[in-house]
Amino acid sequence: MCIRDRLWEPWEVQKGDGTPYKVFTPFYRRGCLAAAPPRAPLPAPQIGLATPPSATSVDDLNLLPAEDWGEMLAPHWQIGEAGAEARLQAFLDGGIAGYKEGRNIPAKPHVSRLSPHLHWGEISVNRVWHAARDHNDLPAEDVDNFCSELGWREFSHSLLYFNPELKRRNLQTKFDGFDWREDDGLLRAWQRGMTGVPFVDAAMRELWQTGYMHNRMRMVTGSFLVKNLRLHWHHGEAWFWDCLVDADHANNSASWQWIAGCGADAAPYFRVFNPVTQGEKFDKDGAYTRRFCPELADLPDKYLFAPWTAPKAVLDGAGVRLGETYPRPVVDLKQSREDALAAFARLREGAV
């Protein structure tokens, strides 16, 4: 693991009065970019590892579950330092050009997928930052946008440093009285990618099958959980922690508080991502959704993100039987949005 896995330490980026930033833009622009530049990456150490003494093998202790989940995830990753370097070079050679716009489209290769390597210390964030900054052939706006995403990582770590209970407590304490629902059936449907809302289900299946989820999809699925289903963000944080290969206390907790509206610089609670229009905008040809929801592959694009609106003849032609081959929606998107906004209004008015 990297001893220091941040570009700036939290205590190095504070406001003039010595208090921590609570909003990302001034944190990054006035704090990070105005501070001393991140140090250059250090060369890899030359360490001779001693041969360990013989001992009982881990397998003999029967500590691991019988089902090897890692076996399913492994084909999607080149694990280790060499894999991290290869991933970085592939991103610099192809993915980062067009990053500003392409990073929101899950079927395109415009995200770095370096977060697992950063989390496990297989590459340093300094190496990634300087590799992007020093690559003279890259569009400046794409590099700046990518580096600002590394800045969000710094912001999350700063929030955790100054708020060590970030994983457990709302940063905005008014949300302590929010009217969350408890429904194990809805939670299981969300976890399994069986909500009947294809763009959400595709993302949840990507998570289960690969240990990863595109950032746009993390926002869409998070919004669906805490707003349409109105289940506590703790449930989402715990599931992502269990399933993501890049699971990180700071990023995971801060991101869930952001989407729930109870965190620092949070998305307002009344901003509810519509998974139908999100799919139509960011997965126009349906490549991502069809990859992870193959039972819907033959649906026309017009109905792919809302199959419950398709005429029976269209469903029959695509081999889709709602409630059998693919679930009906677990909630009505319009009504559940209105219910969420009503719950927030009660909180704001102190009527909860």
Regions found by a protein language model. Give the residues of each.
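Glycine/tryptophan-enriched, flexible segments
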Residues: G18-K174, F282-D283, A287-V352
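Short, solvent-exposed loop/turn segments at secondary-structure junctions
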Residues: R6-L7, R29, V226
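Glycine-rich, charge-decorated loop segments at or immediately adjacent to ligand/cofactor-binding or catalytic sites
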Residues: R6-D17
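Active-site-proximal binding-pocket segments
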Residues: P109-D301
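Conserved small/polar residues in nucleotide/adenosyl-binding loops
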Residues: M1-D5
